[in-house]
Amino acid sequence: EGAKDVAVYRDLDVIKEAFTGKKVAAMAEALFEQGKTTLAETLIRKVKIAGIAAPSGSGETEKASALVQAVETLRETDDDWYILLTDQDGDEAVKALCAWAEATEPTEAELGAGEEDHRKLYFGRTQNKSLAVTNRRSIVIYGDQDEEYPDAAYVGNVGPFYPESVTWKFKRPQGLTVPDLTNAERDALEEANVNFLTVEYKREYVKNGVCADGEFIDVQMGADYIAKNMRENLYDIFLENPTIGYTDAGFALVAAGVFSALNRATDLGIIALDPESEQG
């Protein structure tokens, strides 16, 4: 909806003024205004927003590729973020962003070649009941109301728990309308690992809290957090010690960084406790 330099915003009114009449302002409102139904003890009050020119191309596939390239261009100057939301929800855009998100996690070979790990997680909305994507690191939620943004509302409602492990199913994002779906359509969305707001026994909640590949959202986010925390611990050890020898003491020092990350993950519920040993 127009090029604009990336900036950090902490105030919804400032966002509305900077992006008057644009989808991003409505998405920010859905993200911020979750205080009535969230189970978290806090709310999201800090976001990074960047504006890009409308993707160009002769068809939706080319435009989707241009969108991904624009995101990659932004990453060249600012890669210090984790979750991506966009105002584009066309089929080709969602498919391209799902594929992009999966590719942001470097392979062991790429890490060995010196590539940094700045893996991302994509949350997107679709209005297509038959959308089929199976990418890792991507969460798609169905919504049939043009003026509602279930992807932003979902992140705003459950995201504040991060990095604590939390079930993304059975959550009730504020400001969403339950989509008009038949039983067969709900079953199809479940089989496709597309999340959606539903009503069962007169209770509204999101089913099923999964990524497009079927992995639970909290499992994916937990794995990412462990990798991030472990890497930071190891870099701190390397930077704070003039020499780390190939000795028992050196190995123990490095191992301490690894176990510190795992213990932290256990405290956050990412790694389960053994009921007998009470260890992660």
What is the predicted role of each segment?
Residues E1-G280:
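Surface-exposed assembly/interface segments
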